[in-house]
Structures are given as C-alpha cells and as structure tokens.
Amino acid sequence: MKRAFHVVYTALALNFIIPVLIYIFDPQGAVAGFVQVGQLFSATPYPHSEDSMLWRVLGIANVATLGFSCVLLQVNLRRYFAALLPLLFLKSMASVGFLVAYVSEPHPSYMAACLFDAITVAAMWFFATRAHRAMA
C-alpha cells in the first residue's frame, strides 16, 4: 500500500505543481484549458474573462499549498499525517465551490471540475489513510 500511496501522491503533487507554473507563466492557457473542458460537453461559451491578478495570486497560493502538502505527506507520512486534514478540506472546498457555481450558473466546466475534485479528495483520503494504517 505504501508504493501505491507514493505513486498516487506523486501524480497528485504534479497535478498541482505543474498548474502552478502554468498559472504563473501562462494564465490565459489555464483559462483556455478550463474553457475547452466545457466545450467538450456544451456549445455554450464560458461567460467570464477570468482576467484578475487578485484571483490569479490566490489561485497560485491555493494550488501551491495543495502541491506542497502532497510532497510533505510523501516525505514522511507518519510525521506529517496531520497535514492530510487541511489538504482534504482545501480540495473539498474547491469541489463544493464548483458545485455552487454550477447550481448558480450551469456551465459544464464547473460540474467537470466539481467531479474531478471530489474524485481527487477520495483518492487523497483513501491512499493516505491506508498507507498510514499499514505503517502502524
């Protein structure tokens, strides 16, 4: 189970760290990817420009924290296991936020992000708790 944990958490860490670099160096590319997901499911154009330095900085901080937390857990799961709870909370809030966005403005990109984040939270919890239990 420890090997599976490390494989999954490596994928998760990269899933957060690579987008941070994209948010920093190609923010329009990040928005374009989000828009493309919506276009797969609908012809409805994404209704927002997403051109704000404030939200870009907050997004970078949020996603960098997710990546850093995944790396911490990989470095020493037993020592940093308490970091799992805020990691799960942060990603769960993103999932709930996308669900609320979808309910108020039903664009398919929101639902796709909600479901992807929910699956990510489940994987984070499952693999970390199983590996931690196996260490005991």
Question: What are these regions, as identified by a protein language model?
Answer:
Residues 4-26:
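N-terminal signal-anchor transmembrane alpha helix
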Residues 25-35:
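Membrane-helix interface motif
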Residues 67-82, 102:
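Juxtamembrane helix-break-helix junctions at the cytosolic face
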Residues 78, 95-113, 129:
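Membrane-helix boundary connector in multi-pass membrane proteins
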Residues 82-98:
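Hydrophobic alpha-helical membrane segments
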Residues 118-136:
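Membrane-water interface at the C-terminal end of transmembrane alpha helices
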